[in-house]
Amino acid sequence: MRIVIQRVSHASVTIEGRVKSEIQKGYLILLGICEDDSTEDIDWLVRKVIGLRVFDDENGVMNRSIMDIDGEILVISQFTLFASYKKGNRPSWLRAAKHDISIPLYNEFCTKLSAALGKEVGTGEFGADMKVELLNDGPVTICMDTKNKE
């Protein structure tokens, strides 16, 4: 499981001309799921996302978490995070999980993240053509991969 976390001032996702979800200060998370991902991967990522301290304290030091600032989170499914580009110039997404695996894991991630955050996270629509708008804050962008827990 891979995520890209972007610290944002605000973000939204629009599908077919209609805003599905929007947030103010917090995280926009792009979530990629591969075939061997599990509930354990979700639990690890949720703990990391909730505990991550990348918001400034009163001294301008990144020392506050999403919980400390009462922030919001928008989660967008993003199979392209598992692009393979070893051969040729057109990427392949063979490592990305199929819908029957990825949809339940995406939903579980969002549910567990909402529970940990104490409020509903915003979501896109799995498999839809989405227009995602965001205003990066910093910018601060962090990548996490459950297969490489550094």
Give residue ranges: language-model regions.
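N-terminal, polar/charged subdomain of small-to-medium soluble alpha/beta proteins
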Residues: 1-89, 97, 103-150
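Glycine-rich, phosphate-binding/catalytic loops in enzymes
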Residues: 93
